[in-house]
Amino acid sequence: MTTLTRQDLNFGQVVADILCEFLEVAVHLILYVREVYPTGIFQKRKKYNVPVQMSCHPELNRYIQDTLHCVKPLIEKNDVEKVVVVILDKEHHPVERFVFEIAQPPLLSISSDSLLSHVEQLLRAFILKISVCDAVLDNNPPGCTFTLLVHTREAATRNMEKIQVIKDFPWILADEQDVHMQEPRLIPLKTMTSDILKMQLYVEERAQKST
């Protein structure tokens, strides 16, 4: 058994690669399952050895990719606490918030076999849970949109400003109404614990969705 710090083997970069790839798949699947966009813009693919739905819409894909591209350096430095997919009604009030809580251990204890051996299996379980989450959620009103929020640790502010200059992708402070819902229903979906990553996914659902 070997103990490593986060600096060894460029550990932060490994976690960021894994997590950003997963989050891209997860966001597409949430948008499909919750019918934020017409089903016709999605195509069936295979990720983590299970079928998923991925958007074919260039502008939508670019927004998701650009956001995660800018989040990636923050994950490398362990500056990200949450990534949130917020589904908004026509009045831009949140009806659902899919919250991915992320934590990375400061030390790793790994065996001689693969560092990542169990992680893909755990992420597959998240994807399968998202695929059937509509069974525990109420229907959303028509005409919904979405936005991606990133909750960072306080020390991340300077890093975000640097990334904004380099990537030419503006970070905007989230509106209070996007961040909070009054007395939402909380639905836990999945939790994982591995040597390199801990993650929890839950949904905050607005009690009254009709507009």
UniProtKB/Swiss-Prot annotation:
It is found in: Nucleus; Cytoplasm, Cytoskeleton, Spindle; Cytoplasm. The keyword Nucleus applies. It comes from the Eukaryota. One of its GO terms (molecular function) is identical protein binding. Coiled coil: none annotated. Adapter protein able to interact with different proteins and involved in different biological processes. Mediates the interaction between the error-prone DNA polymerase zeta catalytic subunit rev3l and the inserter polymerase rev1, thereby mediating the second polymerase switching in translesion DNA synthesis. Translesion DNA synthesis releases the replication blockade of replicative polymerases, stalled in presence of DNA lesions. May also play a role in signal transduction in response to DNA damage. Homooligomer. Interacts with rev1. Interacts with rev3l. Interacts with fzr1 (in complex with the anaphase promoting complex APC). May interact with cdc20. This is Mitotic spindle assembly checkpoint protein MAD2B. It comes from Xenopus laevis. The gene is mad2l2.
